[in-house]
């Protein structure tokens, strides 16, 4: 079990985010002390009224009215100050959360892709949204309450000792009790709060998975199973929350109220019924009033431990993401010129020693067309990801333009090497925004790219042209049109190396022809690396690399590999047989119709 001293580094780091708002926070703290002094003055006025006016049967109207007006004025003044300081704390809290979310998103955007292979998306979303919102409560509720309670307690102690130091000494006996309760609460609540945050992240992750996979869930009638799974996650979160509520219910308000009542009884017994009669009624009233008010800020201080624990745990989760590894790039800013590729004895494993690529060698001259083929799981997409610099190599070296890939800067690598992925990401934005992706590219260049991939006619047919929104995940486009849009996205800034990861799979023949037309247009000034399932699309490749279980088993041109009658020849014959079978089936269907 970690002590408060172990939690302090995280809390200190969270509080440091408030440094840009030191001035408004300082003004808010000053307002708190002034408001506390105004609140504490109320019982002093009533004590004076009882001992000097009621007890002596001296009640001049002007003085009584003046005391009443002063009492009401002080309370209204305190309320106004509390409102003003609340606004200042909220302003600082919103600013802190905004900066924190910016930093978290920046950290997430700069993480290596390998981190997302094992980290559920819902967990990341929970840290950016839910955890940062809990941290907002640290400023709005915890810090504000602690400072306000401290100011109020301090002002009341000054007033109590000024009235009667003996009674004040009895009253402060509650402080050691409060300290013990806070230590016990912190010891037992921390692990429970961590479980609450973890279960909430699991719920977010589950919802994200269900929403993204809704079509599959409904297709295979899995609604009940996923509903049960989400119900179990919700029950776990509920049980953990109930544990915190039970702990709060026992250790906080009821227990402290009991101790406060016992001390109040002690005051009455020691001084209220004292035969010496040295304690005036007004003073006794003031002490009873202060002790009743003292109980509330002390309870608030201990109650805030629950929110403090949640904020610290949320901060740990946020900082874990922020302090995670960053995608590493080199410092060589020189842009790629020729687009040559050299893969020298490269081996790669996603984790441990389970190699998915073994001793791969490949040399691609400038402006050449190289194809990667192989069955599913052979390592084609992995090799493409390595060429993009997404993962560090386990062994060997990749050189682009004769320079180690690891030495290239972020700008040099991303401007020089582009990739069209198998499942293109389409933003819920306009045609134009999906092509430019925030880059400074003219509309004329966008139209040229759309013409190249044969999407210009589609864009013109839409209501607002290239300013037409494409819907969530590009639902207004077909699978083939998404592929063409992804290709246009990389062609607006012609890269030196273009990688197409399974770009000709699962698309219609018309889209395939459009892709081939676009590739023919860029081959003169771009090195092409194509991963193809349809071997008919790569018969013109300068080099074909055949992968099998992570190893390069064959390499050559289409004709050379067919003549060798190896694995490539087997794959080609299987595809021909499949195409002939599909053609005969279509012919039979047309005859029967």
Swiss-Prot record:
Domain named ABC transmembrane type-1: residues: 25-310
Pfam family, one: ABC_membrane
Top EC class, one word: translocase
InterPro entries: AAA+_ATPase, ABC1_TM_dom, ABC1_TM_sf, ABC_transporter-like_ATP-bd, ABC_transporter-like_CS, P-loop_NTPase, Type_1_exporter
Keyword Transmembrane helix: yes
Residues exposed to the Periplasmic side: 47-62, 162-164, 276-278
Molecular function terms from GO: ABC-type xenobiotic transporter activity; ATP binding; ATP hydrolysis activity; ATPase-coupled lipid transmembrane transporter activity
Cell compartment(s), UniProt: Cell inner membrane
Keyword Transport: yes
Record field: transmembrane: 26-46, 63-83, 141-161, 165-185, 255-275, 279-299
Alphabetical list of PANTHER family matching this protein: ATP-BINDING CASSETTE SUB-FAMILY B MEMBER 10, MITOCHONDRIAL, ATP-DEPENDENT PERMEASE MDL1, MITOCHONDRIAL
Protein name: Multidrug resistance-like ATP-binding protein MdlB
Gene source species: Escherichia coli (strain K12)
């Amino acid at each position: 079990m970690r002590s408060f001293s172990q939690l302090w580094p995280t809390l200190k780091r969270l509080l440091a985010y408030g440094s840009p708002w030191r001035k408004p926070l300082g003004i808010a703290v000053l307002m708190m002390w002034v408001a506390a002094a105004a609140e504490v003055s109320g019982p002093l006025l009533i004590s004076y009224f009882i001992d000097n006016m009621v007890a002596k049967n001296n009640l001049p109207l002007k003085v009584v009215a003046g005391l009443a007006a002063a009492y009401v004025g002080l309370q209204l003044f305190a309320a106004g100050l509390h409102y003003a300081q609340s606004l200042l704390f909220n302003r600082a809290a919103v600013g802190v959360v905004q900066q924190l979310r910016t930093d978290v998103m920046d950290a997430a955007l700069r993480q290596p892709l390998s981190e997302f292979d094992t980290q559920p998306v819902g967990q990341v979303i929970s840290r950016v949204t839910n955890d940062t919102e809990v941290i907002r409560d640290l400023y709005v509720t915890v810090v504000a309450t602690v400072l306000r309670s401290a100011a109020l307690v301090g002002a009341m102690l000054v007033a109590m000792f000024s009235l009667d130091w003996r009674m004040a000494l009895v009253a402060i006996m509650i402080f050691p009790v409060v300290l013990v309760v806070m230590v016990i609460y912190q010891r037992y609540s921390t692990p429970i709060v961590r479980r609450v945050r973890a279960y909430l992240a699991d719920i977010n992750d589950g919802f994200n998975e269900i929403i993204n996979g809704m079509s599959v869930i409904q297709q295979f009638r899995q609604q009940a199973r996923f509903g049960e799974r989400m119900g179990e996650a919700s029950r776990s979160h509920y049980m953990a929350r109930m544990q915190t509520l039970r702990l709060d219910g026992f250790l906080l308000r009821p227990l402290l109220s009991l101790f406060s009542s016992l001390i109040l009884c002690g005051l009455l017994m020691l001084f209220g019924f004292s035969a010496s009669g040295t304690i005036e009624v007004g003073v006794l009233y003031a002490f009873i009033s202060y002790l009743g008010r003292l109980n509330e800020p002390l309870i608030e201080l201990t109650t805030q431990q629950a929110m403090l624990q949640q904020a610290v745990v949320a901060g740990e989760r946020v900082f874990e993401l922020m302090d995670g590894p960053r995608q590493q790039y080199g410092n060589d800013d020189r842009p790629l010129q020729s687009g040559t590729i050299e893969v020298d004895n490269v081996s790669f494993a996603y984790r441990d020693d389970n190699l998915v690529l073994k001793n791969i060698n490949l040399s691609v001259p400038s402006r050449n067309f190289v194809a990667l083929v192989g069955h599913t799981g052979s390592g084609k997409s992995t090799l493409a990801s390595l060429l993009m610099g997404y993962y560090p190599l386990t062994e060997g070296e990749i050189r682009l333009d004769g320079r180690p890939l690891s030495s290239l800067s972020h700008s040099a690598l991303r401007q020089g090497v582009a990739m069209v992925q198998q499942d293109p990401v389409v933003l819920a934005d306009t045609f134009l925004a999906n092509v430019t992706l925030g880059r400074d590219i003219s509309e004329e260049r966008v139209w040229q790219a759309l013409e190249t991939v044969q999407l210009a006619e589609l864009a013109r047919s839409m209501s607002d042209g290239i300013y037409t929104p494409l819907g969530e995940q590009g639902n207004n486009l077909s699978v083939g049109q998404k592929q063409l849009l992804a290709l246009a996205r990389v062609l607006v800034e012609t890269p030196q190396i273009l990688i197409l990861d399974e770009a000709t799979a699962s698309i219609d023949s018309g889209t395939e022809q459009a892709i081939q037309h676009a590739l023919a247009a860029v081959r003169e000034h771009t090195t092409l690396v194509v991963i193809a399932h349809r071997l008919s699309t790569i018969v013109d490749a300068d080099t074909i690399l055949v992968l099998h279980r992570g190893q390069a088993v064959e390499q050559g041109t289409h004709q050379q590999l067919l003549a060798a009658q190896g694995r490539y020849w087997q794959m080609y014959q299987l595809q021909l047989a499949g195409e002939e079978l599909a053609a005969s089936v279509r012919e039979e269907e047309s005859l029967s119709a």
